[in-house]
UniProtKB/Swiss-Prot annotation:
PROSITE patterns: ADENYLOSUCCIN_SYN_1, ADENYLOSUCCIN_SYN_2. This is Adenylosuccinate synthetase. Substrate binds at residues 298-304. It comes from Bartonella tribocorum (strain CIP 105476 / IBS 506). It is an enzyme of class 6 (ligase). It is found in: Cytoplasm. SUPFAM superfamilies: P-loop containing nucleoside triphosphate hydrolases (SSF52540). The active site is at 13 (proton acceptor), 41 (proton donor). The gene is purA. Signal peptide: none annotated. One of its GO terms (cellular component) is cytoplasm.
Amino acid sequence: MANVVVVGTQWGDEGKGKIVDWLSERADIVVRYQGGHNAGHTLVIDGVSYKLSLLPSGLVRGKLSIIGNGVVVDPHHFVAELKKLCDQGVKITPEILRIAENAPLILSLHRDLDAIRESGLSGLKIGTTKRGIGPAYEDKVGRRAIRVMDLAEKDTLMAKIERLLRHHNALRRGMGVAEIDSQALYDELMQVADKILPFMDCTWRLLDEGYREGKHILFEGAQGALLDNDFGTYPYVTSSNTVAGQACTGSGMGPGVIHYVLGIAKAYTTRVGEGPFPTEQINDIGEFLGTRGHEFGVVTGRKRRCGWFDAVLVRQMVAICGVQGIALTKLDVLDGLDEIKICIGYELDGRKIDYLPSSMGAQARVKPIYETLEGWKAKTAHTLRWEDLPVQAVKYIRYIEELINTKVALLSTSPEREDTILITDPFAN
């Protein structure tokens, strides 16, 4: 028995969807433990693309899939995404999909607040998806959130709504926005209550039972560790913890049940939205990586910023997340380049450093120190065996391993799940 956490080690979009899908075939249970529907991923199965942003990837494989308490759930999006998958022929029932009863809900007022803030009326622009994720987490921490279980308790729901609106209507008055009527919000929730409640469960008990029965549990992270609210490029981060440790608090399982942490990293670096990006290439290389790698957001369609592989950042996240192996993705995007650069350190105010400081000012001032490697002309795309990789590609991978202090466990050579070279099976530990 082994339970595996999958975590992105960059700013998200590392290719977690494909890797989770590949691993879910070996898993019995797949659980989402943080985030909301702000981070999407695409699964390609038998030539069919499935785009997910809230539902666990295991659903497409018919595995028991759980949305944990660490996830904020937009009930309207939940219903829409469920319908879209069902329309594609995926059979989804309450027997294979469960939602934590204590998961907070994203409401229309959260989306309103997110959009107003991001429009620039309130100062710093973070680059959010405007889907209400941050405001929903604020209400969770502020102990005023409406949770899934509240939909089943209609006799107390109105009182909880009124308490929530005392806070939000005060904000809306200050921003010059019309207040929300409590009955209107109650009616909004009642429209979806019957569609979401059949999936509600005490999910920590389900997971505990599965663990005691010796089932393989796969913890599916969203976004990337560099967007973590504590350890990311603050304030240009998300509103939840995205590091591997969140798998425990976001699911209701203790750290002793985790046996392997698999980090996901692209063979180069991308970022969506605002914030520091030391190795960003605003030039032909950046355009090449973006075009070859199809670097556009699944959820927003926004063009991703692109740059060279930053070993400093990945090594930092490997340490913070306790990563035991890396799944390296999109190696094939680098095919054909004459030379490839890797960031091996930074220069900050005239001195060399080997980590990214927490200070917003320092993060903006660091300059990357590069080492240049010879590229390769032969294709790595669709390669299925390690020994068939170009020599220079192998050297590139080995150097990355040396720099980030962990080994490559899986190598992805195309979006197709079959194009995966297994070096170390995370579930074998």
